[in-house]
Amino acid sequence: MNKKVLLVLCDGMRPDALTNCQAAQKVLKNCVSTMNAQTVMPSVTLCCHMSLFYSMIPAHHGTKGNTYVPPSRQLLSLFDVLAIEKKKVAAFYSWGQLRDLCYPASLDYSLMIKGGNYGYEKANDRLTDAAIGYINQELPELAFLYLGYPDEAGHEHGWMSEEYMRSLENSWENIVRAMEAIPKDYAVIITADHGGHDHTHGTELPEDMTIPLIFAGAERDLVDNLENVNIIDIAPTIAALAGFAPNADWEGKSLLK
């Protein structure tokens, strides 16, 4: 198997909010998904991203908050594993702490637009533009697109607020735009790092811990049982799509048949 992958992560996206998101519903009509995947605890952004890309629980990668803690031994993330195999990988993001998701030399291309300066809505739009252009020109094996607007809206206005719902609509409009613009043989995986409640997250509440995992591209028919899915299962699944075995240290499982 040799599928190229676009991985989109909407920071703070609650699955129950997608019911009223028109752009999301367009995609969900023709996909394979679970709205009951689980993230890790503590349910905060950097910790959850580390668990996604390193496929292990926070106690094992060492970052248990939004401050990066170098692992006590050498670990390889999804980016690193693909880079070792000479595969082209790229990242587009608006939150600077995500720079620590791999060794610096593992990324062929990296674009960070500071959401706090430019605004997360504008950052969503510009990062999507950049990802579309790069994918169509370079055809990377993995492109990671981080859309940070929902988390920003949740903290400022409250999860499930009108502004939060608008941030989801913007994010999904960008997802639809990307899906329509890139080659149709790309796998497209859409997920979140955590949810949220009131103006915060980080607890064991279901609103914080439950995330969607959506397979919306060329990989739809390859996905197997989506029961008991955890965020640490995403990296092994992408590795399998790319044709590689998971790293020996990874703790998640592939979700492919």
Regions found by a protein language model. Name each.
Residues 1-257:
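Feature captures the catalytic ectodomains and active-site-proximal regions of enzymes
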